[in-house]
Amino acid sequence: IEIDPASVHSVEILKGPASLMYGSDAMAGVLIFHSAPTLAKGDMRANFSTGYQTNNGLFDYSLNFAGNQGGFVWNTRYSGKMAHAYKNKYDGYVFGSSLREQALSQLLGWNYRQGHSHLTLDYYHLTPGIVEGERDEKTGELEIPDGYDAKSYGKPMPYQQIHHYKAVLDNSWFLGDGNLKLLLGYQQNRRQEFEEEENPKECGLDFMLHTVNYDLHYLSPEMNGWKFSTGINGMWQQSINKGSEFLIPAYHLFDYGVFATVSKKIGKLNLSGGIRYDHRHLHSKALREEDDTDSHRSDWNGFVLNGSESNGSELNDSFRFQAFKRSFEGVTGSIGLAYEILPDFNIKLNLARGFRAPNISELASNGVHEGTQRYELGNTSLKPENSWQFDLGLDYSSPIISAELSLFANRINHYIYSEKLADENNQPVLIDDTPAYQFTSGDARILGGEASIDIHPVERLHFGNTFSYVNSVQLHQSSESKYLPFTPAPRWVSDVRYEFVCDGKTFDHLFVKLQMDCNLRQNHYFAANETETATPSYTLLNMYAGTDVKLHGKRLLSLYLSGENLTNRAYQNHLSRLKYLDVNQVTGRRGVYNMGRNFCIKVVVPIEL
């Protein structure tokens, strides 16, 4: 996600009718990253933050300046980050795991009595390495080039380079007691992969994605407890291949969705509902590898693009991608309620019908996905996913105990996933010496939930426990294909937190937290053709501390310390693609392991203006 973490003020999770405003990709809900709200009139603030991590030498910094003078508002932020290769107990330093990141954001706007108009300009530049996990057969160690310095902040081959530009115009107007919002956005994302030592400035994969987003919706004033909202939103996209290697075809896409939601408050009961219609049209272009008989000869990297439509009869093996058009449409809806059973005890229920159109990677991939050791193949016959989901939420709060329970049951038709291919001898299919995976679909049932409890017998002491579980089953399949791939393992997180000083003269909000992060063994995996393997359980011990430092009654700085994976446990997360890289022939262990012990320090300094 091309987002500067330092710019995120809060994170919101939307489910139920409210998520209908966000289109087909919001089938399971919406995760919204909110930036900081604009300041009050006459206020100006600045701050500087910096941090360091010992495991991979990660150094980051961020400078922010915001203000509001007579309704003219601004918010400027510049952030940077760099890290060398991380290390763990089994692999040592992991070649290709270094990164560099830069981000610049500028908000300019005007707040007035009838609403606001804000223009946000963002630039994000990420240069991550690519972990290939190739090993020396004799020693079992990860292969590294001669003269490689594991603590270098440079860019060892291979690596990616991502440039992301974004402009968003956010308008809001009050119409009586109602509200009209118009949002227009443009994004340009260019992703390049560099892998040739002989030609370090020439990239293999190079594609550029243009996206235009639009959103217009109206929220009515409350009338006898009723609220209505209606609108239209969608996007236009164009993707262009500029390199000599390819993963997905060039394409353009247009979609739109119209929606309406309603809510009603009746005493302690809140009712809500909504409906949405989505339509998406995708036009994927052909790409043909040039041969001597081609009349459209080109010296451009040995390839020529053909954007014309074809019925497929004249296509032959020289075509990397075949042109096709697909249209998808679906109707979604949701009904929900929230009821205050007791002043401290609430219940939420929601039933939703979901829809998701397959994306271009799932439909038309045909190339090596670097860093995953996969040759990915799309499937143009895929159908949209359709689902029914039921959610139940309970929450209770008292001076001593706070508890939440969230359960869900999801039935998805045509659930899309990728499967490793095997030949008639049950041996992996290799394309360009890389295992081949193809997108397919099936009917799925997904059950799960999360339970959390926080016990605070005294104000300063907290005992927290959270347990999450997901069971995802593919219906009417053999035992090897029963469980869906990339299902997270059951997880239990337990912590104890104590605040030593509250409103102290020198130290304020001083706290220490000890945490145990226990990930249970995942035996529910997609075993067909060895697409996945079981993942052993592991437990991580972490420690966190923080305080505000004050001088003459004013906050001078905030200091945060942490130690993660204190026991230096070697582990692999079940969702990590790195666990399927090369086998260590000496130890028999497969893949690359996650980061080992890591200590962090972070300082945030407010600047008075």
Where are these regions (language model features)?
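Structural signature of Gram-negative outer-membrane beta-barrels, strongest in the C-terminal barrel
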Residues: 223-229, 233-235, 243-412
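C-terminal beta-signal and adjacent terminal beta-strands/loops
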Residues: 356, 411-414, 418, 518-525, ...
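Outer membrane beta-barrel strand-and-loop segments of large Gram-negative receptors
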Residues: 202-217, 377-383, 389, 398, ...
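Transmembrane beta-strands of outer-membrane beta-barrel pores
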Residues: 50-56, 69, 80-84, 112-114, ...
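Transmembrane beta-barrel wall of Gram-negative outer-membrane proteins
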Residues: 56-82, 92-131, 159-176, 222-223, ...
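N-terminal periplasmic accessory domains that precede
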Residues: 1-3, 13, 25-49, 61-63
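Flexible loop and strand-edge segments within Gram-negative outer membrane beta-barrel domains
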Residues: 83-85, 95-97, 101, 115-176, ...
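Gram-negative outer-membrane beta-barrel transporters
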Residues: 408-411, 429-522
